[in-house]
């Protein structure tokens, strides 16, 4: 059962929260907390409910995310909770706005990259700025933010700060470990809260995802869920067209489901989208299909994805973080990297953790793909 105030978004009501989640929600306003937990443990849900708690206390909070797709997702949920639509923001948008209000002008950047903010230069300037007004901040997917950002946050000293992070989902070039976040924010070890249970996946999906977990990382594998389901499967299809026909047929047979299609390469993404769209127009015109590509003139609006509603969403790997779908398809898995590096395994860990019910791997090769070798015994070859 989901909260009826949240059309399309599966947001549990307060009475449906677990004991560990309720304990987090009951932490006093004015706390500085670090919450760790793997995919499906409810980190984003807890950020939303704590933001709602602050609103009831007449305190307006801001929830920062790293990518626009997750921002669009949480914006929909926030509006349904009665939170202002501007309560959610990407990290970069917030940083530019905050710098303009604090110092005037654009923030200093490094290497002629507008997204690589020079937080150390900002830290030096903060010594000359009066004390900041009260701020209530939640940071989701905090492992994707640079550690220098947290050092500046420590100087700003928000009135209430909660960081949600999973070290095993660091798939961006600039990132932070759990220990780096804790140290930068001077958070006591006792104020690090760990969420353990997986509320999203079926057990077969969670078992596959766990095979791509990188050992020796502070954020652990979640407790395996009890919910049973179908075994994730690999389908060897001869061409991209056949992969797209497979996806379209599935969507036609399951019109009420939200389906995520993940593509590794950005240059391949429009081909996959156009191929599926063409099949839909020919055979299933009632199915909705959307795509998000950052910076693209036609498909650069994450809000247009209508996250949480039925239909097909075509995304690339970098937009996967924080999302969830009923069913997920990974296309071209036979051309993916072979997970010889931790970054490749982390990406697969993130992708395999997105579906609630069904996970399909599609490729052109008849041989079992090297990219899935870690979970070969858990994946059915159809």
Task: Kindly label every feature range from the protein language model.
Residues 5-100, 131-132, 136, 143-382:
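Conserved helicase motor core of SF1/SF2 NTP-dependent helicases
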Residues 94-116:
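Conserved P-loop NTPase mechanochemical-coupling segment
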Residues 113-136:
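Mid-core helix/loop region of P-loop NTP-binding domains shared across ATPases and GTPases
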């Amino acid at each position: 059962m989901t909260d009826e105030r949240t059309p399309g978004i599966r947001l549990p009501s307060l009475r449906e929260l677990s004991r560990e989640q309720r304990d987090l929600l009951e932490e006093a306003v004015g706390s500085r907390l670090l919450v760790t937990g793997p995919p499906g443990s409810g980190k984003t849900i807890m950020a939303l409910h704590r933001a709602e708690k602050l609103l009831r206390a007449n305190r307006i909070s801001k929830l920062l995310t790293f990518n626009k797709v997750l921002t669009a997702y949480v914006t929909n949920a926030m509006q349904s909770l009665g939170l202002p639509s501007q309560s959610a923001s990407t990290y970069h948008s917030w940083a530019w706005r905050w710098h303009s209000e604090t110092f005037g002008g654009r923030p200093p950047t490094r290497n002629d990259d507008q997204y690589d903010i020079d937080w150390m230069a900002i830290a030096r300037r903060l010594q000359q700025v009066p004390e900041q007004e009260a701020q209530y901040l939640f940071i989701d997917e905090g492992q994707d933010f640079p550690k220098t950002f947290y050092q500046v946050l420590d100087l700003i000293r928000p009135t209430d700060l909660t960081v949600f992070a999973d070290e095993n989902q660091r798939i961006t070039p600039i990132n932070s470990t759990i220990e780096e976040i804790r140290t930068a924010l001077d958070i006591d070890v006792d104020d690090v809260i760990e969420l353990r249970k997986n509320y999203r996946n079926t057990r077969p999906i969670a078992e596959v995802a766990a095979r791509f977990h990188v050992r020796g990382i502070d954020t652990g594998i979640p407790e395996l869920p009890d919910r049973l389901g179908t075994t994730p499967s690999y389908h060897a299809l001869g061409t991209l067209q056949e992969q797209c026909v497979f996806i379209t047929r599935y969507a036609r047979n399951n019109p009420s489901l939200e389906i995520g299609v993940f593509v590794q390469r950005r240059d391949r993404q429009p081909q996959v989208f156009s191929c599926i769209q063409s099949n839909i127009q020919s055979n299933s015109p009632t199915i909705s299909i959307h795509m998000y590509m950052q910076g693209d003139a036609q498909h650069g609006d994450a809000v247009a994805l209508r996250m949480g509603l039925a239909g097909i969403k075509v995304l690339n790997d970098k937009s996967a973080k924080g999302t969830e779908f009923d069913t997920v398809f990974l296309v071209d898995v036979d051309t993916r990297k072979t997970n010889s590096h931790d970054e490749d395994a982390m990406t697969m860990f993130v992708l395999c953790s997105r579906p609630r019910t069904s996970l399909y791997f599609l490729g052109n090769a008849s041989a079992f793909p090297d990219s899935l070798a870690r979970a070969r015994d858990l994946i059915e070859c159809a």
